[in-house]
Amino acid sequence: MPNIFKAIKFYFAAPKPLPPGNYAYQAAPDAPFPYRLHLRIEADGSGVLILNGSTVLHLNQTAAEYAYHLIKGNPAEHVGWQIATRYKTSRVKGQRDYGAFTEQLRTLIDTPDLDPVTYLGFDRQTPYTAISAPYRLDCALTYRLPEGVDTAIAPTERVKRELSADEWKKIIDKSWQVGIPHLIFTGGEPTLRDDLLDILAYAETNGQVTGLLTNGLRLADSAYFEQLVRTGLDHVMVVLNPDLEQSWRVLEVICPDDLFTAVHLTITPQNKAETPSLIKRLADMKANALSLSISDPSLAADLENARELAANLGLSLVWDLPVPYSSSNPVSLEIAAGEYAEELKTEGAGKAWLYVEPDGDVLPAQGTNKVLGNLLTDPWESIWKQPH
């Protein structure tokens, strides 16, 4: 009789997660699944999959196992048997679900302007657990600002120097070695660095997903924009100055391209009346997503109206990107846009993402004063073990 109870306990027990670690797959050009995959499996069985170096997929335990089998090249029949054994389901269903998973990956690859961060199997609001490394590293390449902009907007007094391109490459390599799949390059104005293209291209050689946060004005130069795209840049967010026609011309250049484009808009007392028309104009230009902030708490109702309008127009809302210091987004005035945004930043800061200043110092998030260490000179373990 005890053996029966033991068997029942085994039948209903949750399957033990696969071994945590990093796994890679690079198919031959003529392979049936000719893609590049990097998978990070966490101790709880969930995973992060980088698809073709351009999209980060957050996976629940079952989806992470499917990705593991795909990377290992296991036949569908074997996968079906493994899933059936581990999850007490039929072999046919396990094989069918595995086929549906691989087909979903193919669909994502073929989707234009795909969101660079996608969730399979659970909600974006899933709390951050004891992950082995952040999902994203926000790299402020410089705190310099365009000529004519008040330098007091950016915290230039915090840093004594900017890292060189070679030093940033060492940081990029260190981030890749610990399994960080997503790099954001921000500022200040990152396009003021002449070596930006070199830094972006280097991250692409690792297969990391890269994003650029900028005022965008230099992107109005179509030749420069094409160079950025050729480096492998995966997404861009433009901090919009709605009163500057050149800012709109930038969007006319980049929105038609097959590049996920988000736009940040700060709602102020001066532009709140025209905010609905601004958002409609962005939707008409085929921007993919919208980031919002307000310059004063009294604008909370305007923010909520803007959120609803954006959703109705099909614009995704982005809350967790570190908006560059700029005249259109003075840090002293920016306020988190809504309760969900504040919760997201609180939950994710120092866990899902870290912020690296121009000299390599690491902060839990943009705008915080706690230095966890220096990513160029300190061991990763000493930084990650710091209380965040």
Which role fits each region the language model picked out?
Residues 129-167, 178, 367-368:
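Canonical Radical SAM [4Fe-4S] cluster-binding loop centered on the CxxxCxxC motif
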Residues 356-357:
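Short, acidic, Ser/Thr-enriched surface-loop or helix-capping motifs
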Residues 347-351, 369:
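Short, small/polar residue-rich loop motifs at catalytic or cofactor-binding pockets
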Residues 307-336, 361-388:
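C-terminal accessory region of radical SAM enzymes
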Residues 136, 154, 165-186, 193-302:
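Radical SAM/AdoMet-radical enzyme domain recognition
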Residues 1-64, 68, 128-130:
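Acidic, low-complexity/disordered tracts enriched in E/D and polar residues
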Residues 1-10, 55-139, 166:
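Long, charge-rich, low-complexity alpha-helical segments
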Residues 333-347:
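Short, basic/aromatic recognition patches
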